[in-house]
From Swiss-Prot:
Annotated NCBIfam families: ileS
Subunit structure: Monomer.
Single Gene Ontology BP annotation: isoleucyl-tRNA aminoacylation
Top-level taxonomy: Bacteria, Bacillati, Bacillota, Bacilli, Lactobacillales
EC number: 6.1.1.5
Species in which this protein is naturally found: Streptococcus pneumoniae serotype 19F (strain G54)
Protein family membership: Belongs to the class-I aminoacyl-tRNA synthetase family. IleS type 1 subfamily.
Binding site for L-isoleucyl-5'-AMP: 554
Co-factor(s): Zn(2+)
Compartments, as annotated in UniProt: Cytoplasm
Protein name (record): Isoleucine--tRNA ligase
Domain free text: IleRS has two distinct active sites: one for aminoacylation and one for editing. The misactivated valine is translocated from the active site to the editing site, which sterically excludes the correctly activated isoleucine. The single editing site contains two valyl binding pockets, one specific for each substrate (Val-AMP or Val-tRNA(Ile)).
Domain of life: Bacteria
Enzyme class, first EC level, given as a word: ligase
GO molecular function: aminoacyl-tRNA deacylase activity; ATP binding; isoleucine-tRNA ligase activity; tRNA binding; zinc ion binding
Length: 930
């Protein structure tokens, strides 16, 4: 037997290298085979419910890192709730209708207008479901637990029926109406868009300054006067029917020197406009308030059949332009509102493809709206005063990335204005984890217009509306519920397969159809109505979930998207918000803080991370960032997170190895019988348990990450485990000192594994497989550890906090001695302490082997005053010299008692007593040489 064999060196097959890319799929298959998700739900039956309702990602392509961050965050929350006494099922979902899928099929060569519509919809459905399957595997590969075999998908018959019923309730309450308001119109997708489908980009446009001649000045202006107008959308002049001024803005009547004409502009802008128009010298003839100009009549710049009325509008400012804007009610919301109030014609001169129509005039007909500027300039002639190119923020179609226009077309609307205050009142009842989120959603609802819910597309849920022979729209409870039942049985494609009369209840009559003839609506619903109905299609209809949901968690863009549409439909139907809490996340940016895009080549695919690092590293990264704001991710950042993971793993490996001979049922030492330092670590660990449990409850992942890493690095690695080897390796295998420390090791190991499970389930299960005395076969079926309190814990914490200060001072003294070449390692030191009474009392109170805690070979507490050469602090001073004696071959301490024993071992007296007591045969035979 060799002397080293008398050491209790930790033994374990738990590998240092995780091998996550290879092992994770193996674990995931084992969980699936064991039906772990279902078993967890069965365990929690009857407990308080917690419903995190999954916002559906769009089913198109593989998931990106933003999807991963969101789904991992949800998984951490659901897992932690499941392990905290809640019944917390998770039903993943997908959004499957809409233009992107139509675009994919178009790129694949499918010609929608040349094939049977039902066949086309079948292709859309098949493609959508193939993408659901693809993303399902992507999410499962992240280790996300949920009811993956029974997700919700917005194209299924049960979901579509639930959506129709949401619409029906809104129709019954009078919230659905048809109007010809201007809406965001995407010529590139030939459809109206909702606000949530708009994104803003910089656009360079031609802006024109031109003048309308006064036709009837109403006794205020002469007919040789011109009102100067500014526009950034020249094509809309073809539909201009008025000029809008600000009632309280001051305007001046001016005449430039050498110019026969007189002009009206905002007084505040005269100087800048004079420079722009080349007016070297201007005479101000008169000043008017805007309200004095009301109802003056001007000529259209070129259409002699059109008069343009001067009207008042609150939206006019003097921030730019001339303080006067032309008003085309068919091409803008503000224009429409003031135009309707003043009985102006709502003219629309651009078709659904962005092409100028016949009513724009023969010179314009057939041109694309963006290309008409030269024609407009030609038509304006000498009425054009200036033109310039400007860059401004402009709305784009979020899917096609093309600019959109405002365009008045007949559409179906949800009248948000009718129940706006109800929605605002409900927002006040919701808990927002970011106060700015509440303000943002509140202001969006407060300021938004009515919701355009119709779309001129085919791949979506049809609007369940019929038309009588006289054109009356029919959307009554009887017909809508009948459609819902048909969809429930056959799916929404039946709408396109059957004639209108076959979609109506048998025997249905209507006074507007004396001949019994009916037509059906051909528009579909906005996809935000699809996902915005999920509270009904899923949360209400799935018995395992509870409505309102406890939590909605999505990206911050969903304040204008899913948070918004869900809120509107839920309040419209039931008068309550669909969620009790909202937690929003920022966007994942690259390592430099730039937006990720394929064109820049700075994207990170979750699959690449899984191959290089493993999903665990991505999961740990999610907790390492403040996801309430935008976050950064790169392979370098993930490499740093991987190092943190390695530190966590190897710390826990040390605990596994050094409890391999510990049977908790037989070897646990009662708390009251622990050493003071062991009690301290037990209490500190329970502080960590409380911090992490509270942070899980508040969804504060970064708090968990910081607290866990700090505990492992500072409390364990830099302190407790730093001197642990002197106990667990050196002392007798069954000695009290070793069992005391193993008791703490095992307690921390088991509980920290449970605490890690929601974040690192693969690693936690791997650790759990080495804990043979734990009864649950999977750690995911266990509960998070409860927070314990202990007698005198505050007193113990105070004592050890003071000792840590003392230890820090001692380490500085040792470092100085090391720098002065007095010692090499700290075990070579003889440390002499010169304490005052406070420190002396402290060292007695810790009731421990202080030399062992400081990892020095010898420690003396001196009674005499410190010498001049001592390193002094306020309460204590230190001197360091090389310890006397020889190095013990067993414990490596320098000890005066170290000597060669009769059994061929050079060891100290302490090690000799351990060896002689525990290894009598080896002592009798003598140890082998090293």
């Amino acid at each position: 037997m060799k002397l080293k064999d008398t050491l209790n060196l930790g033994k374990t097959e738990f590998p240092m290298r995780a091998g996550l890319p290879t092992k994770e799929p193996v674990w995931q298959k084992e969980w699936e085979d064991a039906k772990l998700y279902q078993r967890r739900q069965e365990l929690n039956q009857g407990k308080p419910h917690f419903t995190l309702h999954d916002g559906p990602p769009y089913a198109n392509g593989n998931i990106h890192v933003g999807h991963a961050m969101n789904k991992i965050s949800k998984d951490i929350i659901v897992r932690s709730k499941s392990m905290s006494g809640f019944y917390a099922p998770f039903i993943p979902g997908w959004d499957t209708h809409g233009l992107p899928i139509e675009q994919v099929l178009s790129k694949q060569g499918v010609k929608r207008k040349e094939m049977d519509l039902v066949e086309y919809l079948k292709l859309c459905r098949e493609y959508a479901l193939s993408q659901v399957d693809k993303q399902r595997e992507d999410f499962k590969r992240l280790g996300v637990s949920g009811d993956w075999e029974n997700p919700y998908v917005t194209l299924t018959p049960d979901y579509e029926a639930a959506q129709i019923r949401v619409f029906g309730e809104m129709a019954n309450k009078g919230y659905i109406y048809r109007g010809a308001k201007p809406v965001y119109w995407s010529w590139s997708s030939e459809s109206a868009l909702a606000e949530a489908e708009i994104e803003y980009h910089d656009l360079v446009s031609t802006s024109l300054y031109y003048a309308n001649k006064v036709k009837d000045g109403k006794g205020v202006l002469d007919t040789d006067t011109y009102i100067v107008v500014w526009t950034t959308t020249p094509f809309t002049i073809t539909a201009s029917r008025g000029l809008t001024v600000g009632a309280d803005i001051d305007y001046v009547l001016v005449q430039p020197v050498g110019e026969a004409r007189k002009f009206v502009v905002a007084a505040e802008l005269l100087t800048s406009l004079s420079e722009k128009f080349g007016w070297a010298d201007v005479q101000v003839l008169e000043t008017y308030r805007g309200q004095e100009l009301n109802h003056i009549v001007t000529e259209h710049p070129w259409d002699t059949a059109v008069e343009e009325l001067v009207i008042l509008g609150d939206h006019v400012t003097t921030d730019s332009g001339t303080g006067i804007v032309h008003t085309a009610p068919g091409f803008g919301e503000d224009d429409y509102n003031v135009g309707i109030a003043n009985n102006l014609e709502v003219a629309v001169t651009v078709d659904e493809r962005g092409i100028m129509m016949k009513n724009a005039g023969p010179e314009f007909e057939g041109q694309f709206y963006e290309k008409v500027v030269p024609t407009v300039i030609e038509k304006l002639g000498n009425l054009l005063l200036a033109q310039e190119e400007i860059s401004h923020s402009y709305p784009f179609d979020w899917r096609t990335k093309k600019p959109i226009i405002w365009r008045a077309v007949p559409q179906w609307f949800a009248s948000v204005s009718k129940f706006r205050q109800e929605i605002l009142d409900e927002i006040e009842k919701v808990k927002f984890h970011s106060e700015w989120g509440k303000v943002r959603l509140y202001n969006m609802i407060r300021d938004r217009g009515d919701w355009v819910i119709s779309r001129q597309r085919t791949w979506g849920v049809p609007l369940p509306i019929f038309y009588a022979e006289d054109g009356t729209a029919i959307m009554v409870a009887e017909t809508i519920e009948h459609v819902a039942q048909l969809f429930e049985k056959h799916g929404s494609s039946i709408w396109w397969e059957r004639d209108a009369k076959d979609l109506l209840p048998e025997g249905f009559t209507h006074p507007g159809s004396p001949n019994g003839e009916f037509k059906k609506e051909t528009d579909i619903m906005d996809v935000w109505f699809d996902s915005g109905s999920s509270w009904n299609g899923v949360v209400v209809n799935r018995p395992e979930l509870t409505y309102p949901a406890d939590l909605y968690l999505e990206g911050s863009d969903q304040y204008r998207g899913w948070f918004n549409s869900s809120l509107i439909t839920s309040v419209a139907n039931h008068g309550v918000a669909p969620y009790k809490q909202i937690l929003s996340q920022g966007f994942a940016l690259d390592g430099k803080g730039e937006k990720m895009s394929k064109s820049l080549g700075n994207t990170i695919a979750p699959s690449d991370v899984e191959k290089q690092f493993g999903a665990e590293i991505l999961r740990l990264w999610v907790t390492s960032v403040d996801s309430s704001n935008d976050v950064r991710i790169s392979m370098d950042i993930l490499s740093q997170v991987s190092e943190t993971y390695r530190k966590i793993r190897n710390t826990l490996r040390f605990l596994i190895a050094n409890t391999s001979d510990f049977n908790p049922a037989q070897d646990t030492v009662a708390y009251d019988e622990l050493r003071s330092v062991d009690k301290y670590m037990t209490i500190r660990f329970n502080q960590l348990v409380k911090t992490i449990r509270d942070a899980y409850a508040d969804f504060e992942f970064l708090t968990i990450y910081k607290a866990l890493v700090n505990f492992i690095n500072v409390d364990l690695s830099a302190f407790y485990l730093d001197f642990a080897k002197d106990v667990v390796y050196i002392e007798g295998a069954k000695s009290l000192e070793r069992r005391q420390m193993q008791t703490v090791f095992y307690d921390i190991l088991v509980k920290i594994t449970k605490l890690l499970t929601p974040i690192l389930p693969h690693t936690a299960e791997e650790i759990w497989s080495y804990l043979e005395f734990e009864t649950e076969d999977f750690v995911q079926l266990s509960e998070l550890p409860e927070v314990q309190t202990f007698a005198n814990q505050e007193e113990i914490l105070d004592t050890w906090a003071a000792f840590m200060d003392f230890r820090g001072q001692a380490q500085k003294a040792l470092e100085e001695a090391r720098n002065a070449k007095v010692i090499g390692k700290s075990l070579e030191a003889h440390l002499t302490v010169y304490p005052n009474e406070v420190v002396k009392t402290l060292l007695e109170a810790v009731n421990s082997n202080v030399a062992q805690l400081l990892i020095v070979s010898e420690l003396t507490i001196a009674e005499e005053p410190a010498p001049e050469a001592a390193l002094s602090f306020e309460d204590v001073a230190f001197t360091v010299e090389r310890a006397a004696g020889e190095v013990c071959d067993r414990c490596r301490r320098i000890d005066p008692t170290t000597a060669e024993r009769s059994y061929q071992a050079v060891i100290c007296d302490h090690c000799a007593s351990i060896v002689e007591e525990n290894f009598a045969d080896a002592v009798a035979e003598g140890f082998e040489e090293k």
